[in-house]
Protein backbone atom coordinates (compact mmCIF):
# COMPACT_ATOMS: atom_id res chain seq x y z
CA UNK A 1 0.00 0.00 0.00
CA UNK A 2 1.58 3.35 -1.02
CA UNK A 3 2.10 6.03 1.60
CA UNK A 4 -0.05 9.17 1.39
CA UNK A 5 2.97 11.19 0.28
CA UNK A 6 3.56 8.80 -2.63
CA UNK A 7 -0.07 9.08 -3.72
CA UNK A 8 0.06 12.88 -3.51
CA UNK A 9 3.20 12.91 -5.64
CA UNK A 10 1.58 10.67 -8.24
CA UNK A 11 -1.44 12.98 -8.43
CA UNK A 12 0.82 15.77 -9.71
CA UNK A 13 0.78 14.06 -13.10
CA UNK A 14 -3.00 13.93 -13.40
CA UNK A 15 -5.03 16.50 -15.35
CA UNK A 16 -1.90 17.37 -17.32
CA UNK A 17 -2.36 18.90 -20.76
CA UNK A 18 -1.41 16.38 -23.44
CA UNK A 19 -0.83 17.97 -26.85
CA UNK A 20 -1.94 15.94 -29.89
CA UNK A 21 -1.32 16.98 -33.49
CA UNK A 22 -0.70 15.38 -36.90
CA UNK A 23 2.96 14.81 -36.05
CA UNK A 24 2.42 12.97 -32.80
CA UNK A 25 1.81 13.56 -29.13
CA UNK A 26 3.59 15.67 -26.52
CA UNK A 27 3.44 14.53 -22.91
CA UNK A 28 4.56 16.84 -20.07
CA UNK A 29 7.68 15.79 -18.18
CA UNK A 30 6.91 13.42 -15.33
CA UNK A 31 3.60 12.32 -16.84
CA UNK A 32 2.97 8.76 -18.00
CA UNK A 33 0.03 7.64 -20.14
CA UNK A 34 -1.47 4.33 -19.03
CA UNK A 35 -3.83 2.87 -21.63
CA UNK A 36 -4.75 -0.11 -19.48
CA UNK A 37 -8.36 1.01 -19.11
CA UNK A 38 -8.95 1.04 -22.89
CA UNK A 39 -6.63 -1.68 -24.20
CA UNK A 40 -9.31 -4.36 -24.44
CA UNK A 41 -11.69 -2.02 -26.24
CA UNK A 42 -8.98 -1.07 -28.72
CA UNK A 43 -8.36 -4.78 -29.31
CA UNK A 44 -12.05 -5.21 -30.18
CA UNK A 45 -11.81 -2.42 -32.74
CA UNK A 46 -8.72 -4.00 -34.30
CA UNK A 47 -10.38 -7.42 -34.47
CA UNK A 48 -13.42 -5.88 -36.18
CA UNK A 49 -11.13 -4.62 -38.95
CA UNK A 50 -9.70 -8.12 -39.39
CA UNK A 51 -13.19 -9.65 -39.55
CA UNK A 52 -14.31 -7.12 -42.15
CA UNK A 53 -11.23 -7.77 -44.28
CA UNK A 54 -11.77 -11.54 -44.07
CA UNK A 55 -15.45 -11.08 -44.96
CA UNK A 56 -16.57 -12.93 -41.82
CA UNK A 57 -20.35 -12.63 -41.50
CA UNK A 58 -20.86 -13.13 -37.78
CA UNK A 59 -18.69 -13.37 -34.68
CA UNK A 60 -18.55 -12.82 -30.93
CA UNK A 61 -15.11 -11.85 -29.64
CA UNK A 62 -14.43 -11.60 -25.90
CA UNK A 63 -11.35 -9.71 -24.75
CA UNK A 64 -11.64 -9.82 -20.99
CA UNK A 65 -14.12 -7.16 -19.91
CA UNK A 66 -14.87 -6.07 -23.49
CA UNK A 67 -16.94 -7.93 -26.07
CA UNK A 68 -17.30 -7.31 -29.79
CA UNK A 69 -20.62 -8.39 -31.31
CA UNK A 70 -20.07 -8.52 -35.06
CA UNK A 71 -22.74 -9.53 -37.52
CA UNK A 72 -25.22 -9.00 -40.28
CA UNK A 73 -28.30 -7.82 -38.39
CA UNK A 74 -29.33 -10.79 -36.27
CA UNK A 75 -29.24 -9.96 -32.55
CA UNK A 76 -26.93 -11.45 -29.93
CA UNK A 77 -27.56 -12.35 -26.29
CA UNK A 78 -24.87 -11.31 -23.80
CA UNK A 79 -24.77 -12.08 -20.08
CA UNK A 80 -23.67 -9.46 -17.55
CA UNK A 81 -21.49 -10.97 -14.84
CA UNK A 82 -22.83 -11.09 -11.31
CA UNK A 83 -20.38 -8.77 -9.52
CA UNK A 84 -21.22 -10.34 -6.16
CA UNK A 85 -20.39 -13.90 -7.24
CA UNK A 86 -16.98 -15.54 -6.98
CA UNK A 87 -17.63 -17.26 -10.31
CA UNK A 88 -16.76 -15.32 -13.44
CA UNK A 89 -19.21 -17.51 -15.38
CA UNK A 90 -22.25 -16.47 -13.34
CA UNK A 91 -24.46 -13.71 -14.76
CA UNK A 92 -27.26 -11.77 -13.10
CA UNK A 93 -28.83 -10.30 -16.25
CA UNK A 94 -28.69 -10.44 -20.01
CA UNK A 95 -28.80 -8.03 -22.92
CA UNK A 96 -30.18 -8.73 -26.38
CA UNK A 97 -28.27 -6.52 -28.80
CA UNK A 98 -27.44 -5.90 -32.46
CA UNK A 99 -23.81 -5.64 -33.56
CA UNK A 100 -21.93 -3.34 -31.14
CA UNK A 101 -19.29 -3.31 -28.41
CA UNK A 102 -19.98 -4.04 -24.74
CA UNK A 103 -17.51 -3.23 -21.95
CA UNK A 104 -17.78 -3.75 -18.20
CA UNK A 105 -15.70 -2.20 -15.43
CA UNK A 106 -16.08 -3.34 -11.84
CA UNK A 107 -14.50 -3.46 -8.42
CA UNK A 108 -14.72 -7.26 -8.17
CA UNK A 109 -11.96 -8.24 -10.61
CA UNK A 110 -8.74 -6.93 -9.09
CA UNK A 111 -8.49 -5.97 -5.44
CA UNK A 112 -6.78 -6.68 -2.15
CA UNK A 113 -7.90 -6.36 1.45
CA UNK A 114 -6.02 -4.75 4.30
CA UNK A 115 -7.33 -4.01 7.76
CA UNK A 116 -10.80 -5.15 6.76
CA UNK A 117 -10.92 -2.65 3.88
CA UNK A 118 -11.13 -3.74 0.23
CA UNK A 119 -9.02 -1.73 -2.21
CA UNK A 120 -9.96 -2.24 -5.86
CA UNK A 121 -8.02 -1.23 -8.98
CA UNK A 122 -10.19 1.58 -10.40
CA UNK A 123 -8.67 4.77 -9.03
CA UNK A 124 -10.27 8.17 -8.68
CA UNK A 125 -7.85 10.64 -10.34
CA UNK A 126 -8.88 13.33 -7.86
CA UNK A 127 -7.93 11.35 -4.74
CA UNK A 128 -5.51 8.68 -5.93
CA UNK A 129 -7.52 6.09 -4.02
CA UNK A 130 -10.07 3.52 -5.26
CA UNK A 131 -13.21 5.23 -6.53
CA UNK A 132 -16.12 5.35 -4.10
CA UNK A 133 -19.19 5.97 -6.24
CA UNK A 134 -21.58 3.48 -4.68
CA UNK A 135 -21.16 1.21 -7.72
CA UNK A 136 -19.85 -2.31 -8.05
CA UNK A 137 -19.98 -2.49 -11.86
CA UNK A 138 -20.85 -0.50 -14.98
CA UNK A 139 -21.55 -2.02 -18.39
CA UNK A 140 -21.48 0.33 -21.39
CA UNK A 141 -22.90 -0.40 -24.84
CA UNK A 142 -21.93 1.60 -27.94
CA UNK A 143 -20.60 1.15 -31.47
CA UNK A 144 -16.92 1.69 -30.63
CA UNK A 145 -14.75 -0.64 -28.54
CA UNK A 146 -12.32 2.03 -27.37
CA UNK A 147 -15.20 4.28 -26.34
CA UNK A 148 -17.17 1.56 -24.54
CA UNK A 149 -14.07 0.59 -22.55
CA UNK A 150 -13.15 4.17 -21.67
CA UNK A 151 -16.71 5.09 -20.71
CA UNK A 152 -17.25 2.06 -18.48
CA UNK A 153 -14.24 3.07 -16.39
CA UNK A 154 -15.10 6.78 -16.38
CA UNK A 155 -18.70 6.10 -15.40
CA UNK A 156 -17.60 3.82 -12.57
CA UNK A 157 -15.52 6.66 -11.14
CA UNK A 158 -18.11 9.40 -11.75
CA UNK A 159 -21.12 7.53 -10.38
CA UNK A 160 -24.59 7.26 -11.87
CA UNK A 161 -25.82 10.87 -11.92
CA UNK A 162 -22.61 12.44 -13.23
CA UNK A 163 -22.30 9.75 -15.90
CA UNK A 164 -25.59 10.50 -17.62
CA UNK A 165 -24.43 13.63 -19.54
CA UNK A 166 -21.25 11.80 -20.61
CA UNK A 167 -23.20 8.83 -21.95
CA UNK A 168 -25.57 11.14 -23.80
CA UNK A 169 -22.67 13.08 -25.32
CA UNK A 170 -21.23 9.94 -26.90
CA UNK A 171 -24.49 8.19 -27.75
CA UNK A 172 -23.79 5.34 -25.34
CA UNK A 173 -26.05 3.42 -22.96
CA UNK A 174 -25.23 1.68 -19.71
CA UNK A 175 -26.20 -0.70 -16.92
CA UNK A 176 -25.21 0.46 -13.42
CA UNK A 177 -25.05 -2.03 -10.54
CA UNK A 178 -24.92 -0.51 -7.06
CA UNK A 179 -23.47 -1.87 -3.82
CA UNK A 180 -26.98 -2.68 -2.54
CA UNK A 181 -27.75 -4.80 -5.65
CA UNK A 182 -30.02 -2.18 -7.15
CA UNK A 183 -29.70 -1.71 -10.91
CA UNK A 184 -30.29 1.23 -13.24
CA UNK A 185 -30.41 0.96 -17.03
CA UNK A 186 -30.18 4.05 -19.22
CA UNK A 187 -32.14 5.03 -22.31
CA UNK A 188 -33.43 2.48 -24.80
CA UNK A 189 -31.13 -0.17 -23.36
CA UNK A 190 -33.93 -0.94 -20.90
CA UNK A 191 -35.81 -2.63 -23.77
CA UNK A 192 -32.87 -5.01 -24.28
CA UNK A 193 -32.27 -5.77 -20.59
CA UNK A 194 -33.59 -8.72 -18.60
CA UNK A 195 -32.85 -9.67 -14.99
CA UNK A 196 -32.03 -13.35 -14.56
CA UNK A 197 -31.22 -13.64 -10.87
CA UNK A 198 -33.11 -13.04 -7.62
CA UNK A 199 -31.78 -10.50 -5.15
CA UNK A 200 -31.28 -7.68 -7.64
CA UNK A 201 -33.72 -4.79 -7.90
CA UNK A 202 -34.29 -2.88 -11.13
CA UNK A 203 -35.00 0.79 -10.38
Which stretches of residues belong to each language-model region?
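Mature catalytic core of soluble alpha/beta enzymes
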Residues: 1-203
